[in-house]
Regions:
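N-terminal helical cap/lid subdomain that shapes the substrate entry/recognition surface
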Residues: 1-57, 62-66
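Short, flexible loop segments at the rims of nucleotide/cofactor-binding pockets, characterized by
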Residues: 46-51, 75, 147-149
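Asp-based, Mg2+/Mn2+-dependent phosphohydrolase catalytic module
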Residues: 57, 61-64, 68, 77-179
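Crotonase-fold acyl-CoA enzyme core
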Residues: 71
Length: 179
């Protein structure tokens, strides 16, 4: 794969990513077949593999005990996100789950963050967006949301740009307890 392939996938919809793969790599499969193949891998990962990062549950428990309202705003399909949240027993910490598909816009637009804010009923200036992808951090920052980032190996290529936009940066979830 090309070295910047993750950059393209982070910013594109599933269909857009399939078009990119088809054109870039000359794939013979239809866009629908490519999407189906990619989704089966994603479904497996969310249903069976993805684990919480160390100290995530402790952080969620502390926030919940402090009465902090939380919801999920994700680019992931609802069924995949729910499968992981339920399997990891952390769905209970969130009052709602919003997906880009259901909102009708990717995280290059602030729609999902605005919907989450409306649901939570909290002031924008105290409603932190936790993000790990540069395009979503840029969107949340431009929409005047405070942004918290946790250093992520998957986002290492964008680390400097993410840090420049973040209001709070933590090296890991364990560091949250020091705030």
């Amino acid at each position: 794969p090309e070295p910047d392939i993750r950059y393209h996938f982070k910013r594109l919809t599933m269909e857009g990513s399939a078009h990119y793969m088809k054109e870039t790599y000359g794939l013979e499969q239809s866009i629908e077949e490519i999407c189906t193949g990619v989704m089966s891998g994603i479904e497996f990962a969310y249903r069976d593999c993805i684990q919480c990062k160390p100290s995530v549950v402790d952080m969620l428990e502390a926030l919940s005990n402090a009465g902090v309202a939380m919801c999920v705003a994700t680019a992931t399909r609802r069924d995949c996100a729910l499968a992981a949240l339920e399997r990891l027993d952390i769905l209970k910490y969130f009052s709602a789950l919003f997906t880009c598909t259901e909102v009708g816009a990717s995280k290059t637009e602030p729609d999902i963050f605005e919907l989450a804010l409306s649901h939570l009923g909290t002031p924008r200036e105290t409603t932190f967006v936790f993000e790990d992808s540069l395009h979503a951090i840029e969107t949340a920052h431009a929409a005047a949301f405070p942004v918290m980032i946790i250093d992520e190996p998957a986002s290492a290529s964008d680390a400097e740009a993410c840090q420049a936009l973040a209001d709070v940066r933590l090296k890991n979830f364990t560091a949250f307890s020091t705030l």
